[in-house]
Regions:
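Short, glycine/acidic-rich beta->alpha junctions
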Residues: 118-119, 158-163
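Short, flexible loop/turn elements at secondary-structure junctions
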Residues: 109-115, 128-130, 138-140, 234
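Metal-dependent nuclease catalytic cores that hydrolyze phosphodiester bonds in DNA/RNA
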Residues: 1-124, 225-231
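Short amphipathic alpha-helical face segments that pack within enzyme cores
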Residues: 53, 162-166
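Metal-dependent nuclease catalytic regions and adjoining charged, substrate-binding loops involved
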Residues: 83-90, 154-158, 166-248
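Conserved catalytic cores of phosphodiester-cleaving nucleases, focusing on short active-site segments
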Residues: 122-150, 167
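Secondary-structure boundary elements
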Residues: 98-101, 128-135, 169-176
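Short histidine-centered catalytic/ligand-binding loop motif
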Residues: 40-43, 75-78, 146-158, 195-198
Length: 248
């Protein structure tokens, strides 16, 4: 049985696919596999920790988060500036009645299921049974971003639409998926964002088309493809040829 304590255990990470795993495989198969096997660890950036700080508040695990991440404090024991800003973000969100309503569901609800016969695990930030699935995101801002030559919503760039499709499929009741979002700007912006069902359906088809290959990679049945751009690929790169500067 999966619990909050063993959700990210090596055994469960290998046994189950997750939304974050799937997105990692879409970005770089080799890097995703190395991370699952414990051969590579993503850098714990300040930006990531600020978002996790806000998450921990809503999970009611902030004291534990502080204990596990002493780097968020100065030598004198005060919160560093970035995490004081996280406190301000929380304060701002708590002043908004609608935001709090969507975040008032059951917290960190774990569910398992299958997509294309592949086991998946999900953890829902705020679950309103029979009504909606809500996921909390804290980001730099709400501006569109460039990816592969296209200017896209951050929802598409970070794969939150794919996450929504997976959550909806595993929850099993075709519930609407919403993002409660806040920015890390000096004066935080906030929004409740819906993703249309046709977009979720499109993303679920993407998952179905790729998940068997990713599962076979996890099982060692096929070799992962390297992207040659991520930190893992850079750290394990072996030069085999000389390249022309115009190819850079």
């Amino acid at each position: 049985m999966i619990t909050s304590e063993n959700y990210f255990s090596p055994e469960n990470n290998m046994k189950y696919m997750s939304a974050s795993q799937f997105k990692a495989f879409m970005n770089c198969e080799a890097g995703a596999l190395a991370e699952i096997k414990g051969e590579f660890e993503r850098e714990k950036t300040t930006s990531l920790l600020v978002g996790s700080y806000v998450d921990a508040h809503y999970e009611k695990t902030l004291d534990l988060f502080k204990a596990q991440n002493p780097e968020i404090f100065t030598q004198k024991g005060a919160l560093k500036a970035e995490y004081k800003q996280a406190e301000y973000i929380i304060e701002r969100l708590e002043r908004d009645e609608l935001f709090q309503k969507y975040m008032s569901g059951e917290k960190q609800v774990i569910k398992t299921g299958e997509i294309e016969s592949i086991p998946f695990k999900i953890k829902i930030d705020s679950y309103h049974p029979g009504k909606v699935i809500v996921d909390l995101k804290v980001m730099r801002d709400f501006e569109q971003m460039w990816k592969d030559g296209l200017k896209l919503s951050f929802v598409e760039v970070w794969g939150y639409d794919i996450q929504g499709a997976i959550y909806q499929a595993i929850e099993g009741n075709n519930l609407p998926f919403f993002i409660t979002a806040a920015t890390k700007e000096k004066e935080p912006d906030l929004a409740i964002i819906s993703i249309p069902q046709d977009r979720l359906d499109y993303c679920l088809n993407q998952v179905k088309e790729n998940v068997k290959r990713f599962d076979d990679i996890k099982k060692g049945l096929i070799e992962p493809t390297r992207c040659e751009h991520c930190d893992y690929c850079k750290s394990t790169k072996v030069l085999t040829e000389i390249i022309d500067y115009t190819s850079l």
